[in-house]
Amino acid sequence: MIWKLLKKITNNSDIAIDLGTANTLIWIKGEGIVLNEPSIIARDTINNKICAVGQEANKMLGKTHPGLETIRPLQDGVIADDDMTNEMIKHFLKKINKNNFSRPRIIICIPSGITKLEERAIKEAAEVGGNASEVYLIKEPMAAAIGIGIDVSSPQGHMIVDIGGGTTEIAVIAL
């Protein structure tokens, strides 16, 4: 299944996103990692206007006045604030100039233990924030194994330890 999915990623309008609790990474085929920024947003509390996202919002962390708040829209590997996650995805795709594709295909890494409801929230964030035509979800340990070049279709077992900002996962992967 996963090999069929990865073989579908054939042009540079296909995007892979590691939507992490601490950082968000975006990868594009042929370009590699094109964005690695903190998963944080600064918002004006009076008019709900977003003032900064990613690195810029991170610089404001702990230095805000009462009318400005910093938000981490993901907690423990899952979406805690749908609207802010959508806005963060939109901002990051705009920043890498990939939001002008008509409707990219997006693959997103997800923690292994999340619920169907949480999976749906992540999918909807990619569809809304990323204007995706198709969204695929892949468990983080599997994505980590593929990312370091492990042949996950082989019968040989591999232990993967994926340590993130909000979750740590340990998995044994074999055909």
Describe the predicted segments one by one.
Residues 1-165, 171-175:
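Nucleotide/phosphate-binding catalytic cleft detector across ATP-hydrolyzing
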